[in-house]
């Protein structure tokens, strides 16, 4: 796999593979998180990242909504089982969505390296530190 930047768009997000071990998922303003949309993002992530384990920064804008049924699905179960996700930072720009994401990740424990924050700078710094530690410890 080469290290050039690649990107793709789904109905709800722009996904950018910036390195073979790092992807950013920027959800589109006004989108709705539902099971079909999350499956679409998951498929796009797999196509961009292949089988290489990676870290992910997800950015959720202020005006995103969600369907309750999407909360009843562990959307990252397969990736976690396969060891694909090393660390996740989720940046939410709305208090309600931050609470929803924290609730979701407590209901479906993902992995030990996960952070939900309202600060993009904090999310990026945290994820960078996690990636540096992973590169040292494996």
Task: Indicate where each model-derived feature is located.
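Amphipathic, Lys/Arg-enriched alpha-helical "gate/interface" segment within cytosolic domains
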Residues: 1-138
């Amino acid at each position: 796999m080469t290290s050039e930047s690649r990107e793709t768009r789904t109905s709800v997000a722009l996904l950018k593979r910036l390195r073979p071990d790092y992807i950013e998922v920027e959800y589109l303003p006004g989108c709705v998180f539902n099971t079909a949309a999350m499956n679409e993002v998951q498929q796009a992530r797999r196509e961009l990242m292949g089988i290489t384990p990676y870290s992910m920064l997800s950015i959720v804008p202020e005006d995103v909504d969600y369907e309750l049924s999407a909360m009843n699905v562990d959307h990252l179960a397969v990736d976690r089982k396969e060891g694909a996700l090393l660390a996740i930072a989720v940046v939410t720009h709305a208090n309600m969505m931050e609470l929803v994401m924290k609730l979701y990740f407590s209901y479906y424990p993902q992995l030990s390296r996960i952070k939900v924050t309202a600060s993009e700078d904090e999310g990026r710094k945290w994820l960078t530190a996690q990636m540096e530690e992973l590169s040292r410890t494996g």
